[in-house]
Amino acid sequence: MSKIRQFLEQVLQMPYYKNYAAASGKVHNIAKHEDATEDLLIQHGFTKHSKGGIPKKQRDDWLKDPYSCTIPDGTYVSQPTGKQDSPDFIVKENGRAYFIECKSVSKKTKAPMYNSGVPKSGYIYVFTAKKYNQTTIYNGSDILS
């Protein structure tokens, strides 16, 4: 079984984590949901790639062709295009890039909010809800179709 699949299966066991940066608008706060997700990436053998500041055009090119991603296999980039842009992580395994965005909602909110207004079809969303104290995953394309 691939490391990315094992990671995603363990994500489904995560409880609710609040995304403090999104909730407060202050990006210097600890974003616990992202931290918990990053901890799982590390537990499953992915290593942080030091290269940051990936241009949005590069991200978009990789999104169109996930096999063109140039970061090393078995690595991930956190906040590749900055804290105010998605995704939260680009993960590469077996030559393919995966785009992972963390979303959380409190009791007051019933649905996740998307920076662009709509989910991105090539993204994997890690969604946690306080009301249910559970996490689920879905593809952006599932919402758009």
Specify the residue positions occupied by each region the protein language model found:
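Beta-rich catalytic cores
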Residues: D85
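Acidic, metal/cofactor-coordinating or nucleic-acid-engaging core segments within structured domains
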Residues: S116-S145
